[in-house]
Curated annotation (Swiss-Prot):
Compartments in which it is found: Cytoplasm
Gene that this sequence comes from: xylA
PANTHER family: PTHR48408, XYLOSE ISOMERASE (PTHR48408:SF1)
Keywords in alphabetical order: Carbohydrate metabolism, Cytoplasm, Isomerase, Magnesium, Metal-binding, Xylose metabolism
Gene Ontology, cellular component aspect: cytoplasm
Molecular-function annotations in GO: magnesium ion binding; xylose isomerase activity
Catalyses which reaction(s): alpha-D-xylose = alpha-D-xylulofuranose
Subunit structure: Homotetramer.
Annotated positions binding Mg(2+) 1: 230, 266, 294, 337
Domain of life: Bacteria
EC code: 5.3.1.5
Cofactors, names only: Mg(2+)
Name by which UniProt lists this protein: Xylose isomerase
């Protein structure tokens, strides 16, 4: 036991009438919604990097947090893990996520970093034995160190490609050893700053081959989890190749991986790409590649990825409605890729940020489930496209342009526009949130 969270009680559900800030008002893990426990719907995960590794810096200032585990030794990494599991237990969090660089100190060589990772993974595995918290996904940090400044899989230097591939192998091994449900790849440096020094064809082909190797290794070691890519349009790169859901799907199709890889979609990244969160979720679901989500929000005025905790439940309800329509999570879940503000220095701030985020998502899920169970929105959607269920419409899809023209002339087809009824549906939505 550490004393970092001393005096903070285990968070329990007390209902909407509770005035206890260290309690859930909406998140009741055992509440059954649409035939499944709320905990199983939401599958919350705590992000190791923002919660325990982030020093509180921003582009204009450095560290504001003074955590007792900050440092570059294995003993401090183990202390960080001990503190992390204490918070997982306080929250009753079912899952966590990590990058390799979050949990182990960087070594002077690849071999030393590999040994450090293996040792800390053993320590985390021991902590997991006494906790309900499991691993939602692991990943490799292929963007922070200066060696990755020109990319990892897309780097012009083959040695960086090699280092990156070896790093991913080790992280996949660690994820499998800890029983992870997924493995994520995020290409923060897989992009370019200027076309003047960039070979787009080579970089795309190398990225595709890299991903094929990842999938091959997954099958070789018998990893039963899902491989996920996380789209983001820019930041830190000027232009990233995994721009959004549509772009990544095209990439997967190009390299024959659309049946092997799904997506981890982040709210903040969707906004940066000029989309709504629900758009990206709905599109991924329609393409069969919706895997998991990173839950956060951006400051809509700042123009960059602020990774704040969610607090707008009507907005989140739109997202969870699309997840419910898609059948819910299988191996995926709701990872809080969110960080407290750099002025929020206290241990209580870290816990309460997660309490608020979990309550916001639970409230959103309940609203989405009520509307989904009511069926009115789906009925309106079906009615709008009902004409396509007729034999004539189905026959038209199997015919040719010449045959369709002949039918239009013969039947004198002259369609009149029909209302999309958007305002009615928005009013319907508001009744449930």
């Amino acid at each position: 036991m550490t004393d970092f969270f001393a005096g903070i009680p285990q968070i329990r559900y007390e209902g909407e009438g509770s005035s206890n800030e260290f309690a859930f008002r909406h998140y009741n893990p055992d509440e059954v919604i649409l035939g499944k426990r709320m905990e199983e719907h939401l599958r919350f995960a705590v992000a190791w990097w923002h919660s325990f590794a982030w020093p509180g810096g921003d582009p204009f200032g450095g560290q504001t947090f003074n955590r007792p585990w900050f440092g570059d030794t294995l003993d401090l990494a183990k202390l960080k893990a001990d503190v992390a599991f204490e918070m997982f237990d306080i929250l009753g969090a079912p899952f966590f996520c990590f990058h390799d660089a979050d949990i182990r100190p960087e070594g002077a060589t690849f071999a030393e970093s590999k040994r450090n990772l293996e040792e800390i993974v053993d320590h985390i595995g021991t902590r997991m034995e006494g906790s309900k918290t499991k691993l939602l996904w692991g990943t490799a940090n292929l963007f922070s160190h200066r060696r990755f400044m020109s990319g990892a899989a897309t780097n012009p230097d083959p040695d960086v490609f090699a280092w990156s591939a070896a790093t991913v192998k080790g992280c996949m091994d660690a994820t499998m050893k800890l029983g992870g449900a997924n493995y994520v790849l995020w290409g923060g440096r897989e992009g370019y700053e200027t076309l003047l020094n960039t070979d787009l064809t080579r970089e795309a082909e190398n990225a595709g081959r890299f991903l094929q190797m990842v999938v091959d290794y997954k099958h070789k070691i018998g990893f039963q989890g899902t491989i996920l890519i996380e789209p983001k349009p820019q930041e830190p790169s000027k232009h990233q190749y995994d721009y959004d859901v549509a772009t990544v799907y095209g990439f997967l199709k190009r390299f024959g991986l659309e049946k092997e890889v799904k997506l981890n979609i982040e709210q903040g990244h969707a906004i940066l790409a000029g989309h709504s969160f629900e758009h990206e979720l709905a599109l991924a679901a329609s393409l069969g590649i919706l895997g998991s989500i990173d839950m956060n929000r951006n400051d809509y005025q700042s123009g960059w990825d602020t990774d704040q905790f969610p607090h707008n439940h009507p907005e989140m309800a739109l997202a969870y409605y699309e997840i419910l329509r898609a059948g819910g999570f299988t191996t995926g879940g709701t990872n809080f890729d969110a960080k407290i503000r750099r002025q929020s220095l206290d241990p209580e701030d870290l816990v309460l940020a997660h309490v608020g985020g979990m309550d916001t998502c639970a409230r959103a899920l309940k609203a989405a489930a009520r509307l989904y169970e009511d069926g009115s929105l789906e009925a309106a959607r079906a009615a709008r496209y009902a004409g396509w269920e007729t034999p004539e419409a189905q026959a038209m899809l199997a015919s040719s342009l010449e045959e369709i023209e002949a039918r239009v002339l013969a039947e004198g087809i002259n369609p009149e526009p029909r209302s999309g009824r958007q305002e009615r549906l928005e009013n319907l939505w508001n009744r449930f949130v």
